Swiss-Prot record:
GO terms for biological process: mitochondrial translation; translation. One of its GO terms (molecular function) is structural constituent of ribosome. It comes from Schizosaccharomyces pombe (strain 972 / ATCC 24843). Residues 1-32 form a transit peptide. GO terms for cellular component: cytoplasm; mitochondrial large ribosomal subunit. Component of the mitochondrial large ribosomal subunit (mt-LSU). Mature yeast 74S mitochondrial ribosomes consist of a small (37S) and a large (54S) subunit. The 37S small subunit contains a 15S ribosomal RNA (15S mt-rRNA) and at least 32 different proteins. The 54S large subunit contains a 21S rRNA (21S mt-rRNA) and at least 45 different proteins. This is Large ribosomal subunit protein uL11m. InterPro entries: Ribosomal_uL11, Ribosomal_uL11_bac-typ, Ribosomal_uL11_C, Ribosomal_uL11_C_sf, Ribosomal_uL11_N, Ribosomal_uL11_N_sf. Belongs to the universal ribosomal protein uL11 family. PANTHER family: 60S RIBOSOMAL PROTEIN L12, LARGE RIBOSOMAL SUBUNIT PROTEIN UL11M.
Length: 144
């Protein structure tokens, strides 16, 4: 029996590496969609991105078995990790400092995050504070 409501699926897919294997295939196939169509369009949209960048996307599935999707910016923690070339954050953030991040880096990450469709209308200062909070929770010291 077909659903009469729209469904939203949230996935994190590596840029340019979408394939109809799990987790994409089962998530879309259970809702009656051809996952290969999504994969082709997703890979085309993320072709210019750095390979293996985790790209969050929100897929909206209509009752007619059609879909639209929006691509969001990579997670803040991933951006910080790539900036500092870290494998992962600190397990005890206040005691084990993994690296230092300048305010210029914070500003650039916040500027990138401001292009995200879900963050439209949020002030850049608020985004900078959010990035600083994420950095501190990862054991990264913010220096001027």
């Amino acid at each position: 029996m077909a659903s009469t409501r729209t469904t939203i699926i949230k996935l994190i897919v590596p840029a340019g590496k979408a394939t109809p294997t799990p987790p994409i295939g089962p998530a879309l196939g259970a809702r009656g969609l051809k996952s290969i169509d999504f994969c082709k369009e997703f890979n085309a949209r993320t072709a210019g991105w750095m390979p293996n960048t985790p790209v969050p996307c929100k897929i909206t599935v209509t009752p007619q078995r059609t879909f639209t999707f929006t691509i969001h910016t990579p997670p803040t923690s991933w951006l910080i990790s790539k900036t500092l070339d870290l494998e992962k954050g600190s397990s005890s953030p206040l005691h084990d400092i993994k690296g230092q991040l300048s305010l210029k880096h914070i500003y650039e990450i916040a500027k990138l995050k401001s292009t995200d469709p879900s963050l439209q209308g949020i002030e850049l200062l608020s985004l900078c504070k959010s990035v600083i909070g994420t950095a501190k929770s990862m054991g990264v010291k913010v220096v001027p």
